[in-house]
Amino acid sequence: MDGNHRFTPDSKEFNTVVKSKESSTGRNPYQTPPLEHNGTHHQTNYSRKKTNLAIIISNFLSEISRPLSNGKINNSTHNILKFLNEVLKRSKCSKENAVLATFYFQKIHQSRGVRDESSLPEFSHCSRRIFLCCLILSHKFLNDNTYSMKNWQIISGLHAKDLSLMERWCLGKLNYELAIPYDEFLLWETNTLMKAKLRVGTPANAPVKRPRESDNDYDANSWKQIKSC
């Protein structure tokens, strides 16, 4: 189960984009993920597939984590979908990365005990933060060359130290068991993730409507953040 890793943190392409952005704009010099100059038709099809996948996963995550929402944490499908579209675009993660991260997410949720809820850290209630950590883990597991925490900091807007802390917590909940037989992985994707899609009833090519509204996850430069869940 090999992921298609286009850009690594130390790649020439990544460094070239950073330098070009530094010289061309006074705003945040980092463009993550790096810009690609492919055909418009290819980009449109690729973006549509990623959007459809994000819809399926966001519905699944919200179905699991919505009961954990509170005054500070909103695990609605709409909020999760906005985050997924942005983080998948910036990280250039493959479908396998995203689906495996969703598998990890469900395992972590299933490991939660009702008696332990009061002792769990607040971030564990935020579906976006937990999925981000699962995405980091799946990216490390599937790719020989993976992003550093500094790169994930650029992608997410969270501090590298916070990401490391949350990653270790997720690893503990997974008992450090990241490997899964490929047949079992495909079976889970078909019987669990795709069935969740059917329950929600979202058409595969349904357009994503994004109402313009204020969101605490955006900073002054319109960079997606996950500071407040």
Swiss-Prot record:
Region: Disordered, residue numbers: 1-46
Keyword annotations of the record: Cell cycle, Cell division, Cyclin
Gene Ontology cellular-component terms listed: cyclin-dependent protein kinase holoenzyme complex; nucleus
Keyword Cell cycle: yes
Aminoacyl-tRNA synthetase found in the keyword field: no
Induction: By transcription factor GCN4. Rapidly degraded under starvation conditions.
UniProt cross-references to InterPro entries, sorted A to Z: Cyclin-like_sf (IPR036915), Cyclin_N (IPR006671), Cyclin_PHO80-like (IPR013922)
A Gene Ontology biological process term: regulation of protein stability
Disulfide topology: none
One Pfam family, short name: Cyclin_N
Comp. bias regions, Basic and acidic residues: 1-24
GO MF annotations in UniProt: cyclin-dependent protein serine/threonine kinase regulator activity; protein kinase binding
Top-rank taxon, per record: Eukaryota
Family: Belongs to the cyclin family. PCL1,2 subfamily.
Assembly information from the UniProt record: Forms a cyclin-CDK complex with PHO85.
Function of the molecule: Cyclin partner of the cyclin-dependent kinase (CDK) PHO85. Positively controls degradation of transcription factor GCN4 under favorable growth conditions. The PCL5-PHO85 cyclin-CDK holoenzyme phosphorylates GCN4, which is required for its degradation by the E3 ubiquitin ligase complex SCF(Cdc4). Amino acid starvation reduces PCL5-PHO85-associated GCN4 kinase activity and leads to stabilization of GCN4.
Protein name, as recorded: PHO85 cyclin-5
Gene name linked to the record: PCL5
